[in-house]
Amino acid sequence: NRSMESTCLLADHRRMVERGNVLLDYLRGAETAVVEFTTGDICEFDLRFRQAGADNGYLHADKQGEAFINLPSGEVWIVPYEGEIPGEKSRTEGVIPVYGDDGQIARFVVNENRVVKVEGEDQLTIDLREELALDPARRNVGEIAFGYNEAAVVSGLFIEDEKAGFHWGYGRSEFLGGTVGPESFRHPDTVLHRDLPYAKDCPITVSVALRYPSGKVCLLYTSPSPRDAIPS
């Protein structure tokens, strides 16, 4: 999309590496991410037994791991704990609002890292219920992520919107470090990973606090975008 040539693709990738490292430091050792939406809904994401990853635009010869990046770049992600350890349930629970293009809002009720119910009375709610009913694996909370590309704007193009602030995703997660892969789904046709953005200028935005095992709480940001809270 050529519109990104004048926005997120112009970002300083050296700064993105630095700022991504700051976010990774915050997430390292965090036990819970408490996300409060501007609708008043709250969801707590269980971050135990997980490591965050970064898509920071770095693609030099000494890059560790696979030699590719996404464009635009600029996000840090983590897969919430999915309850795969015997006897250790996931603590991810709460309510996540989902907005539609026409202003409708449905609410995902989450328990043990799974969407157990979709609340609402409009067409958006019906559509989301039908989407989840196609395969139980779609109910998995598969990602939370923090976009921090300073040049990204909310344009309706998701690959840019997600780099402008917070988003979360449901369904498949193994490609991000989780445990739910294509084999977890009923059929190849029902495999899904869907991301939903809550960045600055989206109809719903968020505040995020991180809790650590020591009891320490870090307010990651209260503004619509983490780009404003990460030290330069």
Go through the PLM ranges and name each one:
Residues 221-227:
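Conserved small/polar residues in nucleotide/adenosyl-binding loops
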Residues 91, 117-179:
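Dual-mode signal for accessory low-complexity, basic/Gly-rich regions
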Residues 31, 90-97:
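Short, hydrophobic/aromatic-rich segments at coil-to-beta transitions
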